[in-house]
């Protein structure tokens, strides 16, 4: 949950297969997060455009969105990822002891300082842990993993495992999710899922371009405005603005609510709405 995701290791291998194999907890946890990251590309790409074009901010201190809640004024262990996600990273090791390893900018890791374990230690990574999370006041929140809805202005205890961090969605959010891919442009975004979180009015602008060049600087891009009216329970997809070579002329969206209800919407660039 950062603007860019890179798994670097100066001279320490970081490939996923260095951490076990499929079916083992560490490997599976890494794979789960990589797949989640790729599914969020429509949200991430659109939010990046907000940063570029409208001077928005990606990783947002809570005070930026909830200035009236004094409890978040000096909070430094939670943040908003875009305007929909509240991220509460687990900042202390929950399964294995931490070890500080010195690094030298010339020679890399000090391997003698790193040391090695005296013996193999079995770690139960599936043992459930927990973390406390403050949900800002003034809005309702949804647990991203379970879709449980809860009111803001209180601290909750969230169960955590190796593959789950506390992650909440602000009521009124519209979150587009993309296909399961191995690389960013493997599949077209012709059937995105739009997760809508009721409880407040909300909006989102889906941004798209050719994805692999600078033609957007010449105006080659599109925006699709989306708006959720909470009182009427209606999602409206506005008329598409702009164009670029190879853009999808028609497509489908699957609109999904936290309670599991969903509806398919055909979209050809003209305003259309769906009611729940």
Where are these regions (language model features)?
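Catalytic-domain carbohydrate-binding cleft regions of carbohydrate-active enzymes
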Residues: 1-164, 169-170
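Solvent-exposed, conformationally flexible loop/turn segments
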Residues: 126-128, 153, 267-276
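Accessory, solvent-exposed terminal regions and/or long lumenal/extracellular loops of proteins
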Residues: 162-271
């Amino acid at each position: 949950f950062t603007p860019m995701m890179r798994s670097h290791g100066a001279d320490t291998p970081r490939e996923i297969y260095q951490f076990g194999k499929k079916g083992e907890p560490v490997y599976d946890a890494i794979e789960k997060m990589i797949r989640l990251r790729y599914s969020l590309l429509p949200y991430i790409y659109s939010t990046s455009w907000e940063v570029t074009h409208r001077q928005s901010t990606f990783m947002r201190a809570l005070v930026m969105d909830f200035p009236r809640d004094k409890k978040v004024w000096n909070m430094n262990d939670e943040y908003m990822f875009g305007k929909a996600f509240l991220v509460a990273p687990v900042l202390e090791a929950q399964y294995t002891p931490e070890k500080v390893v010195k690094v030298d900018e010339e020679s890399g890791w000090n391997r003698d300082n790193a040391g090695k374990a005296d013996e193999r230690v079995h770690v139960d990574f599936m043992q459930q842990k927990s973390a406390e999370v403050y949900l800002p006041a003034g809005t309702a929140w949804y647990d991203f993993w379970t879709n449980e809805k809860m009111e803001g202005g209180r601290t909750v205890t969230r169960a955590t495992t190796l593959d789950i961090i506390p992650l909440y969605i602000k009521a009124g959010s519209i979150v587009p999710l993309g296909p399961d891919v191995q690389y960013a442009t493997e599949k077209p975004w012709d059937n995105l899922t739009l997760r809508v979180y009721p409880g407040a009015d909300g909006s989102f602008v889906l941004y798209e371009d050719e994805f692999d060049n600078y033609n957007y600087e010449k105006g080659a891009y599109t925006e699709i405005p989306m708006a959720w009216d909470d009182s009427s329970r209606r999602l409206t997809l506005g008329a598409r603005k702009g164009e670029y070579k190879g853009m999808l002329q028609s497509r489908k969206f699957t609109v999904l609510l936290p309670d599991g209800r969903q509806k398919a919407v055909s979209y050809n660039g003209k305003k259309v709405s769906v009611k729940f």
